[in-house]
Amino acid sequence: MKVIKYYIFLALMLLGFMPLSAQVYNDLSEQIADAAKQQVAQFTDCLSFIVDKGQKPENRNEFREDALKLFIGQGKTYYDNVLDKEGNVIDKRPHDPVTMEVTSLRNPKPRKKSVAEYLLNLVNLANQKTYRSVSIMSTQWHDMKVSQVRKIAEDQYVCDVYFEQIFESRGLENKLIYTDKTTKRVTVFIKILHTDYGDEFVILLGDIQATETKKNV
């Protein structure tokens, strides 16, 4: 998997666009889509490691911290720039921490939690001794679906990545306690950095929505 550098980038609404030919734009969109899917896959890998009963508690917390680094604001309040008509920064605009929608078969209506809280709940769940195993299995990155890549500013893009997530928990006698399958949509922000060594993608995840939850059969 290609290593992706993580940075927090702000001012997503900068003005100015550079025209691209259709072929160049299509090629760039494919690269962005693949990079976005791989970023989401890194997040889902962290989820599976967090709930793995074979992991030490301190390792679960490390995976939680790694997962938070994939998001805008790293799970905390983040800011973007407010510009005047000349493009000068005149203020900072705060945004609430990114959220994850959670659902269940009993409560299918999505409920929002901060990503930081969601991940902490997974750590606590995996640390409970009442479960023999807890697992989260997600779509492989190459099978994830991506919406149309949209340009929002110069060298800045956004898209939505769709994946399925299967949750399963088993009791001490290995009896299945609960399982479901949820389709999720995550907003992904991409910025292109032009460096002396070539172009780099800076990728950060935004809010995650649960679009459908059903029985895992």
Pin down the residues of each PLM region:
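Bacterial Sec-dependent N-terminal signal peptides
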Residues: 1-30
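Short regulatory "switch" loops immediately downstream of catalytic or recognition motifs
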Residues: 45-52, 72-81, 166-170
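Exposed beta-sheet edge and beta->alpha loop/turn motif
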Residues: 135-217
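Short, flexible helical or helix-coil boundary motifs
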Residues: 8-11, 39, 47, 74
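Short solvent-exposed beta->alpha transition segments
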Residues: 60-137
